[in-house]
A protein has these predicted regions:
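Bacterial N-terminal signal peptides that target proteins for export
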Residues: 1-12
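A generic "folded-domain core" signal
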Residues: 2-4, 25-194
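C-terminal segment of classical bacterial N-terminal signal peptides
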Residues: 17-25
Length: 194
């Protein structure tokens, strides 16, 4: 004869199954559209102490695998610490590219980085993971975003730190299209003997 505990266990299993099967919980594909913030920022400041190098294209070829290329720019603080790195990662046999950001730890992770090209429509990249010295935000880059980056002058990045202050930095895009479409600065190859 079933007891009350068995009935509760059955109800709990049904509730868990219904919650996991509920529609609308899937993560969106591609860079996320602008949504209102859950928590308002307490102020804003511009990160002026970041100096950017030039865009650089590196490619990686391992054995018989398709070539993977990364077009990147790195911004550093005066101390030499990486402040931000932007990567566009493309594989020769894939139609989609991946836009990826490296930012210092200490950001408010519930508010994804916000980017815009030349004050255009903003888009967000969700944080994917954090390491001891940096956090990574990344997603599939819509072709429209790549076209805007190729024709744009600046990419504005807004991050929210753990004090809920919005910090902005402006990343130059003048060389981006030329470097992305050009010959890689380096191609790293790995031969695999079988």
């Amino acid at each position: 004869m079933p007891n009350a505990r068995d009935g509760l266990a059955s109800l709990l299993l049904i509730a868990i199954a219904a919650a996991t099967a509920a529609p609308g919980h899937a993560a969106p594909k591609g860079a996320q559209a602008e949504r209102p913030a859950e928590v308002a920022t307490r102020g804003q400041r511009e990160a002026k102490d970041i100096s950017y190098g030039g865009w650089q294209k590196l490619c990686f070829k391992a054995g018989g695998a398709p070539t993977l290329c990364r077009t990147s720019i790195t911004g550093q603080f005066a101390t030499g610490q990486t402040a931000v790195r932007v990567d566009l990662i493309e594989r020769e046999d894939a139609a989609a590219a991946r836009l990826q950001l490296f930012v210092p730890v200490g950001m408010y992770l519930q508010q994804s980085p916000r980017l815009s090209v030349d004050q255009g429509a903003p888009f967000r990249l969700p944080y994917t993971w954090c390491l001891t010295n940096l956090c990574i935000a990344a997603d599939v880059a819509a072709p429209k975003i790549i076209r805007e980056m190729e024709s744009g002058k600046t990419l504005t990045l807004e991050l929210v730190d753990s004090n809920l202050l919005a910090m902005t930095t402006t990343i130059p895009l003048a060389q981006f299209a030329t470097v992305r479409k050009g010959t890689p600065a380096r191609t790293l190859e790995q031969d695999i003997d079988e």
